[in-house]
Amino acid sequence: MSVPQPTPLRLDTLPDSNEPFAMKLSLSARIAEKFSAKREASISLATLADIAVENGYHALCMRASLIGIHTPRAEVLEAARMLRERGLGVSMVTGDFPIPENSDDGPTALRNITPYLDLAQAFACDLVRVALRKDEDIAWAQRAADAARERGMRLAHQCHNKSLFEQIEPSIDVLRRIGRANFGLTYEPANLELCGEPYGRATIERFAPHVFNVYLQNQRLHPAAKSLMVTWCNGNVPFDQIAVHEPGGIDFPEIMQTLVALGYDGTVTIHDASLGRPREDAARNAAYLRSLARFAPVGQSVAS
């Protein structure tokens, strides 16, 4: 009996030249935020951009702590110009605070998606992060995806606790119910682990047709951990946040090997929370992931 081949993961609209695969490396603005305050940046966008350039990142993943829908248009355009001059793209935009805070107001963006699309478009980015917490959000997600499609843009939901995307099969069912080709998933293994779900090769293959983006953050789960994650499906889970390059957490070698095997040529975003050492961790995380897989040459666009 033949085994069906998994659907290749693809983010790029065109094949990359001279590359068997060409993942791009993105640095999340989350590393620039204060550890316990997602609304406050501890370093400037210019400093974060310099760190990204110094360490061979292709893009930043933009968050509202630096630039959001609340930011004056002139400031947005100046930020976009600054990133272009540094040769950095923007891999995805999270345009407000309720989405990363995962509050009940997170899905509000779906009801008026235009400002989020405008913000992403200013950065020549076609991917916007959104949030769904209740079944009633699905119809709004369909409308928002339709509006995004008219502008050649896409929406993505992260694997995330306390959302409709906590578990594998329910996530796939929600994607099926939304039923829009431009609405997909940001694969993120740490939240899957917190929710008691497997996150390795079989999961990536299951999610493959829907993956628009990859987020990587790291953690250690143990009873004496300092942090507690509340989930709907797995109760309260103690964990310690650690940097991507630190051992004893998520199995990144398996994840990267699977992405390579599936021909993934999209963006891999280091989504570390700030541990008070953004420059050091950004450098060590990039070096670690490059030791696990081949990435596109620096200077190649995230949308090429």
Residue ranges and their predicted role:
Residues S2-A122, R149, R180, A286-S304:
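N-terminal pre-domain/capping segments
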Residues L27, E33, A59, V93, ...:
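Acidic/histidine-rich catalytic cores of soluble enzymes
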Residues L45-A52, V76-A80, I113-L117, I138-A145, ...:
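Generic structural signal for well-ordered alpha-helices
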Residues L88, C125, M153, L262-G266:
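A short helix->loop->beta-strand "cap" motif at the edges of active sites that frequently abuts
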Residues L119-E136, H157, T269-I270:
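Active-site groove signature of glycoside hydrolases
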Residues N213, D265-A273:
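Conserved active-site loop/cleft motifs that coordinate metal ions or position small ligands
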